[in-house]
From Swiss-Prot:
Record carries keyword Transcription regulation: no
GO cellular component: cytoplasm; ribonuclease H2 complex
Residue ranges of domain RNase H type-2 in the record: 95-311
Name of the protein: Ribonuclease HIII
Co-factor: note: Manganese or magnesium. Binds 1 divalent metal ion per monomer in the absence of substrate. May bind a second metal ion after substrate binding.
Matching Pfam families: DUF3378, RNase_HII
Keyword Cell membrane belongs to the record: no
Amino acid sequence: MANIVFKLSDKDITTLMSRITFDTENLPQGMKARAKYQNTTVNIYQSGKVMFQGNHAEAVSKELLPQHSQLNTNKTKKKNMANSSLEQTLMYDQFNCIGSDEAGSGDYFGPLTVCAAFVTKEHVPILKTLGVDDSKKLTDTKIVELAEQLVAFIPHSLLTLHNDKYNIQQAKGWTQVKMKAVLHNEAIKNVLEKIDSSQLDYIVIDQFAKREVYSHYALSDIPLPKKTKFETKGESKSLAIAVASIISRYAFITYMDQISKYINMTIPKGAGAKVDVIAAKIIKKYGLSRLDTISKKHFKNREKAQKILKPL
């Protein structure tokens, strides 16, 4: 399905609205008018942007906005690509979407957690009221607070790849990208079993690999490939991804707290110098084998921690 976007003046919008019949009532927040014309949806936003959506979007846009189509024939594609992040923010939250994201992939300690969540357009106002946002902008305390509310009413699937299984798969030659592709795909399929898929508009995955790479690792088993989109920095473009990010991060934080209690010391997130020091302390107190049960063995932190202990 093609999406073509124009930025119009008030005068041009008035002209467009005189050419076909638009609905102006009971519209999502931020939308000024909507029309169906020749199997194409035409959305006019309060921002002055107009989106043509459908298999005939290009032909319809040329018919209804001939002056813009002629002027922009050679440059609109590049311009729309440059503006795609902004437009996707508008688009996804106007539709019913499954979003998926993961946590723990860049952390030496702790598991890899993946969540897929189904967010309808009716959920959007309450999610905004709750303060749902990119999890990277939220404190751990806020993530826990939000997640405990979200899991109560958002259909979702949360999968956890614990360190023992993670290390086994990595030793078999699985890259982290392959692990994530398999987990994302499985979580999405789990959510599809919980909902009426006829109500689903898009599946939006926080992009960690190109579509063809994801498809390869998922054994070409993407459930609804035509509805599946990949978005970089997806948390800021889709509330469905933001919700999935919060829930997956919540699960990761919970496991990290459990690890800290298990080891009887505060375990830092990430993979920096502080992590090396704590890993060295764990080796000294409990041994390397214990460290491997709560960490990702292939990270450089393991080697660095051992080097810290050598002079001792």
